[in-house]
Amino acid sequence: MPQLQYPECYLAPNRCLVSNCGVNKMSNEELVGQNHGMEGEACTGEDVTFSDVAIDFSHEEWGWLNSAQRDLYKDVMVQNYENLVSVAGLSVTKPHVITLLEDGKEPWMMEKKLSKGLIPDWESRWENKELSTKKDIYDEDSPQTVIIEKVVKQSYEFSNSKMNLEYTEKLEGKHGSQVDHFRPAILTSRESPIADSVYKYNIFRSTFHSKSTLSEPQKISAEGNSYKYDILKKNLPKKSVIKNEKVNGGKKLLNSNKSGAAFSQGKSLALPQTCNREKIYTCSECGKAFGKQSILNRHWRIHTGEKPYECRECGKTFSHGSSLTRHLISHSGEKPYKCIECGKAFSHVSSLTNHQSTHTGEKPYECMNCGKSFSRVSHLIEHLRIHTQEKLYECRICGKAFIHRSSLIHHQKIHTGEKPYECRECGKAFCCSSHLTRHQRIHTMEKQYECNKCLKVFSSLSFLVQHQSIHTEEKPFECQKCRKSFNQLESLNMHLRNHIRLKPYECSICGKAFSHRSSLLQHHRIHTGEKPYECIKCGKTFSCSSNLTVHQRIHTGEKPYKCNECGKAFSKGSNLTAHQRVHNGEKPNSVVSVEKPLDHMNHYTCEKSYRRETI
């Protein structure tokens, strides 16, 4: 293992923490301005423990990181542990968090605060040895920048010298500055934009002023204080590429100064290479490659459907422990993240971030095929699958494939019959929370989506889009069998089942089969007698919402179906269809039934035909 050399400013007064560093005696005036007059001492591996170099995240901070940043964190933690073992030997006990990371599990990280203590004056000296930097595309207060700085900074400190000093325990003597419980910024609501520019991860220029405290945890720099790192500058690709590559394969996260070139004020610094791991572990299902076997094992759960983490409240299972942790918040009802614009609260910071884009309206990611814009690059990636018709997620029970993994999870609940979301008003259960939210609007009569043509309001956006096709009469989806057109692709797919006679949904009571699941649910209410839809005007109840909608037109007088020939309007589409036969001269019931002749035939024997058969 090559010997590491360090600048003098890394060495604390009174002690030399690096073996054979070549510095036998140092000037006290140069380091701290005080006359202690002590020789440097060689240290052992016991001077540094894993807790000195461990990187702790709170639950909120961990939830903010994307997959690439989490992979970077895991690599740094393992690298720190390996460096510690190489220095201290096999006597080091493997920490529990390392075991979790090697097994591909999510770490349970708790917040870690530094105790009040003394800060060495050599940190202020380090401030004078600034490196030239370029303007960063990120604000230095950016939450994501802070988190990544935190990971790489601690790895850098340990890789340099196994001397990650704790201000209260590692230094002797008295110094002027103190820090009160410094910890990284609590992530709030901002997701940093990512562009084709240089990210600069500023590392290790800690500057504190006398008797200053970081009293605002939401900010990484306060008035008179700064926490900046200026050693490492890293070029990263676009955010969409980060999802597939943790770092550019052939480049080092920390530049190694093997040639002994001058560092800072004439001192050399050699840094070990980290995060230069090849992706040799390939998934046999989808071909995605990973740098570690443990990460591949965790990814494999997507294909196998393995979910080892179970919620004790509702029995729902998850593939990762972090997902279970986020889910538990839904049971507690806690919503600590509040939007400052409208006051709406959320249980997860990611949900707040997504919500705030509705206020700003910013959508920087545009689809090159159709021009549609999105606020997040992940939404753009999902949207592109619509154009490519790529369906990666397949149901192992019925073989149906889906573009999105969330759609597969939703679909699988049809087979399991799982309905964990129950309405408190009527007790009806649903398989997903969005269906429950939409159902609850029946009780609250909340209708927030308004048609700009007829001013009719709807409880969901999908209903509004479906309604607007009445005004436009646009039906781009045509059946190749009968040339019937539809305004939605889903309606066409449902219609095609009529031609192939596919009826996969069978009633468990009478055995009758149906082409659509919705038809089965509606039929099942005949056996149960359930009529959940009630008219608020007269109290009449109905088994399906469409019948209630048609009935309400009696009270409102609405007649949306208008004849183009004579202008007559009708409340039902079927009535309009029957009326149009008058203009077309159609008489479909001219054929007389042998078993039950028409009542009119009992008195007349003429050849006149009738549009309707009366029995």
UniProtKB/Swiss-Prot annotation:
Query: GO CC annotations?
Result: nucleus
What InterPro entries does the entry give? C2H2-ZF_domain, KRAB, KRAB_dom_sf, Znf_C2H2_sf, Znf_C2H2_type
Q: Which SUPFAM superfamilies match?
A: beta-beta-alpha zinc fingers, KRAB domain (Kruppel-associated box)
Q: What is this protein called?
A: Zinc finger protein 181
**Family stated for the protein in its record:** Belongs to the krueppel C2H2-type zinc-finger protein family.
Q: Where are the zinc fingers (C2H2-type)?
A: 281-303, 309-331, 337-359, 365-387, 393-415, 421-443, 449-471, 477-499, 505-527, 533-555, 561-583
Q: Name one Pfam family in it.
A: KRAB
Localization recorded for this chain is:
Nucleus
Q: Which organism is it from?
A: Pongo abelii (Sumatran orangutan)
Cite the GO molecular-function annotations of the record.
Answer: DNA-binding transcription factor activity, RNA polymerase II-specific; RNA polymerase II cis-regulatory region sequence-specific DNA binding; zinc ion binding
Its main localization is nucleus
Function noted in UniProt: May be involved in transcriptional regulation.
Keywords per UniProt:
DNA-binding, Isopeptide bond, Metal-binding, Nucleus, Repeat, Transcription, Transcription regulation, Ubl conjugation, Zinc, Zinc-finger
Quote the gene name from the UniProt entry: ZNF181
Q: Where is this cross-link: Glycyl lysine isopeptide (Lys-Gly) (interchain with G-Cter in SUMO2)?
A: K153, K170
Could you tell me which Gene3D superfamilies the record lists for this protein? 6.10.140.140, Classic Zinc Finger (3.30.160.60)
Q: Where is the KRAB domain?
A: 48-120
